[in-house]
Amino acid sequence: MKKNGLFFLILLFSSGLLAQDWRTNWDDAKSEAEKGNKKLILVFSGSDWCIPCIKLEKEIWINSTFNEYAKDNYVLFRADFPKRKKNKPDNVTQKRNAMLAADYNPKGYFPFVVIMDSQGNIRGFLGYEKTSPKDYIIQINQF
């Protein structure tokens, strides 16, 4: 029993170490990208209904290879549009996400990844495709 509890705690804490550090304030994310001369990655996601979004999360965003590279090179921001009431963000976040969608994803594609330079200029777009985290990094860096 003690071994199971210890294993659970190790698993819980180690999974948190692999989780990407997604910014929650858009203005802070833009400022951090500029100050750190990092690419700004804006991700439009439907985390509880969009199957390609869920695959992108599992295959790329939470992968340790991607995370190790991203922490020094990217500032990540997610605008999530869940459908289930229990997953919906607060009203302020919903309004902010809607404004971001109007500016950067007016056609409403999901998942939709906007790659910007450190000054906030759009350099390219990606979506989901079955690829490795290493190849996804290469695609991002081509912009």
Descriptions of predicted regions:
Residues G36-C50:
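Short active-site neighborhood of thiol/selenol oxidoreductases, capturing the structured segment around
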Residues D103, K107-F143:
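Non-catalytic, surface beta->alpha helical segment in thiol-disulfide oxidoreductase systems
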Residues I41-L42, L76, V113:
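Hydrophobic beta-strand anchors of alpha/beta hydrolase catalytic cores
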Residues M1-D21:
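Bacterial Sec-dependent N-terminal signal peptides
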Residues T24-L40, A70:
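A short beta-strand-turn-helix
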Residues W22-R23, N67-K95:
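Thiol-based oxidoreductase modules, predominantly thioredoxin-like and allied folds used
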Residues I54-Y69:
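Typically the conserved alpha-helix immediately C-terminal to a functionally engaged Cys/Sec
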Residues C50-C53, V113:
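The canonical Cys-X-X-Cys-His
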